[in-house]
């Protein structure tokens, strides 16, 4: 998982060092000591200083104090163990608040001096109430630990699992808390895998089969709770008569692929979804019922949607209470630069897209054209990295070649050509969001004609703007070497 960790009073012993400095200075200023031992804050009523005296001392000394802070018991050891267990460590601190000369380098040097491991250091302004939650969303943080009630509430409001590190000043808040690093480590260890649902139009194109394979090769990251079959109409590749026919064929292909993956135990969690699009789907279906059941059971479930988003929209329509319990990563539409959304997953069910976008669900949108379209590969690359000694790899190569050649009108079309495995993007995003460049934006309005109208004051969603193609394929090909 991707863990966001605050520094002061979470990793560092900020308050204990600050208190020592206040007591020391008070001897020369008043020599009255602590006048209110019940005060929650050192700087608010604990000493009988004036506001001006407090502000002057704090301003003149905070940088010196910050540089010599110690580490809370167990913090370094537990962070090391979390890193070793495969978690990504994001240090997210509000020190870019005008109180320090060079806050980034000061913080980096302190972390290095104390041998604190981290994958990424992020600074925000502590006085910006949304500063941390914006960075959490942009970096796909799964869990945040902080001492600030305000920061934790903002994260919770944006469906980010959050824990308070217990301090005297935050005990009034009814927010899940931990009292030590040992306790935090135990909590994380018990919830390490991401609970996911794959919503897929498996028979529509071959990239769905690559995506399911990638997911099943990444079960160290994912706890797959269901595979739900999304509707699709006749495409350029799949030869289907009706949506219902496509659903049946998607179901069969999914079961066959699970056998080939030696994961037949997952065949019992494959569920058929809508056979009509959102507007005409009056009745529920087993996929929608299962999405609702799983969402209500878990604290957070991520739906990896790589087809028309009908099943997700129907689940939200029937059970809006799940909105705060799910995260949707959807491959669909195009970037704003293209000025159109004539893309297969989007155009099939615009009403479903409108429903999901308007619902305020936690949403990550991976556009197809100009983003996922970068995930192109060739016959020669696949044949090089997918050993034909492995039956599954040979099968994937064969269906890729068959699909690619079906779009060729004459032999010369193969020269210098490639094909995109679009659906790998959604799986890769949840494996490592650092392979993507994303932006937190005001949710666009989806017009009836399928276009976006950009906004400035709606709820926030994440749009992916770019991806690191080589990082994703490197991870995929390495995993495909495993039997």
Identify the residue ranges that each predicted region occupies.
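Active-site neighborhood of HAD-like aspartate-dependent phosphohydrolases
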Residues: 1-53
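Short histidine/acidic/glycine/proline-rich micro-motifs that form metal-
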Residues: 9, 65-66, 94-100, 233-234, ...
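Metal-dependent phosphoesterase signature
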Residues: 28-30, 37-77, 87
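Substrate-recognition element of Asp-dependent hydrolases with the DxDx(T/V) motif
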Residues: 66, 75-107, 122
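Substrate-recognition "cap/lid" segment bordering the active-site pocket of phosphatases
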Residues: 97-143, 149-156
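Structural recognition of alpha->loop->beta junctions
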Residues: 108-124, 173-191, 327, 351, ...
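Asp-based, Mg2+/Mn2+-dependent phosphohydrolase catalytic module
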Residues: 137, 148-192
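N-terminal acidic, glycine/proline-rich low-complexity segments
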Residues: 190-483
């Amino acid at each position: 998982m991707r863990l966001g960790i605050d520094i002061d009073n979470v990793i560092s012993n900020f308050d204990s060092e600050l208190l020592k400095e206040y007591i020391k200075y008070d001897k020369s200023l008043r020599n009255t000591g602590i006048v209110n031992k019940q005060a929650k804050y050192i700087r608010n009523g604990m000493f009988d200083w004036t506001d001006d005296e407090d502000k002057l001392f704090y301003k003149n000394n905070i940088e010196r104090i910050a540089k010599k802070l110690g580490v809370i018991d167990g913090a370094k050891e537990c962070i090391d163990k979390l890193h070793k267990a495969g978690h990504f460590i994001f240090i997210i601190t509000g020190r870019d608040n005008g109180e320090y000369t060079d806050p980034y380098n000061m913080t980096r040097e302190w972390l290095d001096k104390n041998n604190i491991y981290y994958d990424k250091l992020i600074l925000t302004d502590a006085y910006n109430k949304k500063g941390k939650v914006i960075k959490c969303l942009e970096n796909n943080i799964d869990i945040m630990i902080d001492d600030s009630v305000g920061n934790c509430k903002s994260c919770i409001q944006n469906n980010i699992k959050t824990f308070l590190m217990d301090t005297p000043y935050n005990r009034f808040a009814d927010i899940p808390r931990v009292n030590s690093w040992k306790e935090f480590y135990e909590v994380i260890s018990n919830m390490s895998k991401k609970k996911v649902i794959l919503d897929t139009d498996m028979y529509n194109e071959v990239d769905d089969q690559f995506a399911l394979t990638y997911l099943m090769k990444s079960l160290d990251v994912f706890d797959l709770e269901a595979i739900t079959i999304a509707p699709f109409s006749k495409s350029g590749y799949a030869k289907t008569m009706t949506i219902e026919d496509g659903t049946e064929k998607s179901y069969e292909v999914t079961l066959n692929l699970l056998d080939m993956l030696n994961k037949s135990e997952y065949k019992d969690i494959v569920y058929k979804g809508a056979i009509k699009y959102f507007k005409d789907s009056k009745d529920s279906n087993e996929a929608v019922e299962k999405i609702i059941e799983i969402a209500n059971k878990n604290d957070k479930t991520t739906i990896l949607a790589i087809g028309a988003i009908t099943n997700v929209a129907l689940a939200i329509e029937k059970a809006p209470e799940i909105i705060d319990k799910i995260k949707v990563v959807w491959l669909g539409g195009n970037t704003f630069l293209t000025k159109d959304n004539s893309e297969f997953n989007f155009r099939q069910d615009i009403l479903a897209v409108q429903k999901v976008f308007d619902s305020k669900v936690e949403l990550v949108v991976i556009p197809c054209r100009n983003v996922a379209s970068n995930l192109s590969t060739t016959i020669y690359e696949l044949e090089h990295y997918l050993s034909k000694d492995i039956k599954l790899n040979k099968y994937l190569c064969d269906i890729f070649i068959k699909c690619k050649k079906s779009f060729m009108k004459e032999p010369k079309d193969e020269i210098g050509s490639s094909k995109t495995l679009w659906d790998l993007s959604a799986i890769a995003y949840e494996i490592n969001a650092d392979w993507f460049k994303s932006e937190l934006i005001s949710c666009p309005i989806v017009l009836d004609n399928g276009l976006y109208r950009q906004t400035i004051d709606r709820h926030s969603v994440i749009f992916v703007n770019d991806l690191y193609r080589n990082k994703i394929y490197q991870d995929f090909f390495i995993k495909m070497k495993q039997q």
